[in-house]
Amino acid sequence: MHLTLEFGGGLELLLENSTKVHKVEVTTPKDGQGKVTMKFLLSWVKENLIKERPEMFLKADSVRPGVLVLINDCDWELCGGLDAELEEKDVVVFISTLHGG
């Protein structure tokens, strides 16, 4: 599944090369469901994109408080949160709202 992942508000600094936009291909889960959920995507991001301090992005199976998540410009909570199912060419944006001033 091809997805576009965008990171902002300082989260891009946790990734290799500090790149804000990543066009990725995520393989479907091997659990037989064949669906890519946000929970699966967060695990995939941790394993494949985060290069340092994953605790600044994730807490347990979800994002840390203060990280805004949008799926196709819609708050992920309105889409189902961790259970939201992603589709081909979706755009997922992660923005940290917590940063120094």
Curated annotation (Swiss-Prot):
GO terms for molecular function: protein tag activity. GO terms for cellular component: cytosol; nucleus. One of its GO terms (biological process) is protein urmylation. There is a cross-link at residue 101 (Glycyl lysine isopeptide (Gly-Lys) (interchain with K-? in acceptor proteins)). Pathway: tRNA modification; 5-methoxycarbonylmethyl-2-thiouridine-tRNA biosynthesis. The modification 1-thioglycine is found at residue 101. C-terminal thiocarboxylation occurs in 2 steps, it is first acyl-adenylated (-COAMP) via the hesA/moeB/thiF part of the MOCS3 homolog, then thiocarboxylated (-COSH) via the rhodanese domain of the MOCS3 homolog. Keywords: Cytoplasm, Isopeptide bond, tRNA processing, Ubl conjugation pathway. It is found in: Cytoplasm. Signal peptide: none annotated. Gene3D superfamilies: 3.10.20.30. Belongs to the URM1 family. Acts as a sulfur carrier required for 2-thiolation of mcm(5)S(2)U at tRNA wobble positions of cytosolic tRNA(Lys), tRNA(Glu) and tRNA(Gln). Serves as sulfur donor in tRNA 2-thiolation reaction by being thiocarboxylated (-COSH) at its C-terminus by MOCS3. The sulfur is then transferred to tRNA to form 2-thiolation of mcm(5)S(2)U. Also acts as a ubiquitin-like protein (UBL) that is covalently conjugated via an isopeptide bond to lysine residues of target proteins. This is Ubiquitin-related modifier 1 homolog. The lineage of its organism: Eukaryota, Viridiplantae, Streptophyta, Embryophyta, Tracheophyta.
